[in-house]
Amino acid sequence: LLSTENIGLNGPFQTVIMQGASFEPLTSQDRATFQATVVHYADKVRAHGAEPMLYMTHAYVPPHPRTDANMIDTIAQTYQAAAKAAQAAVAPVGLAFARSYQQRPDYSLHMTFDGTHPNLQGTYLGACVVYLSLYGGNLDGLNYDYFGRLPKGEARYLQKIAEETIADFQAATQ
């Protein structure tokens, strides 16, 4: 799993990004298992010379049957506790989704058929958050629009959400 030659790389990984299943924060037993698993794999990542990072998942939205307005709070607490126990960084993707839905409730980031998987906009937002979590800075000059499928105004909105989320998350966790 952590052998770079398996994917054609000649050097070690610098960062390994890990994500749990979306249901793991939903019960205390699953949260405990998640945290123990994160600690275990973070140790393996470090043993291979890399740093661990967690990709914080986003909350379910309708039509998912387990939609809960407070789900993102549970997710954030779960990921932050696991990151602290594992001494890992967090890419707060779930918080970026929540911020976007607060600012523009009708702007969808999820596939409409299940309310759990991200659509193009959600995937773009997640990528922006991960980029900023890894490299810092800002997204000025990022012109990628998925071959014209993401209008420039939408791309800039999602970049702004990512930048604001990272700034607030870093201020709250440092």
Features from the language model and the residues they span:
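Alpha-helical cap/lid subdomain in secreted, periplasmic
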Residues: 5-120, 132
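Conserved catalytic region of serine esterases and O-acyltransferases that act on ester linkages
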Residues: 110, 117, 127-174
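Mature-region segments of soluble proteins
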Residues: 122-125
